[in-house]
Amino acid sequence: GPNDLAATLNVPLGMNNQHPKHVEAVNKVLEAGKKHNIPTGIHCGSPEEVVERIEQGFLWMPLMSEVALMKTSFMASMKQINEKSKPSELKSDGKFY
C-alpha cells in the first residue's frame, strides 16, 4: 500500500502522500498497469482521495481500514452529540443510579 511504498522510498508516511518521489512511483505503477492491461489500485484515506484516484485512472480504491472508518464515524457522531447537547452544561453527582 501507500505507506509500504513510502517506507521503501524512505519518505514520510501518510495517505494521499504528495512527496515527489511517492507521486512519481505511484504514477509509474499506474502507467505500468495501463500498459500491460492490469487493473491497478491504491488504498485511499478519504472519499475525496477516492474521487481523485478514479480521475487518475485507478480501478480499485479501498477506503480506509475498518478501524479508521469506525473512528471517523465515531468522531463525527460525538461532534454532533456535543454540538447539540452542550455537555459542558450537564451536571452530575457522579452516581450511576
Language-model-derived ranges and their functions:
Residues 2-97:
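Expand to "…catalyze enediolate/carbanion chemistry for C-C bond making/breaking, isomerization
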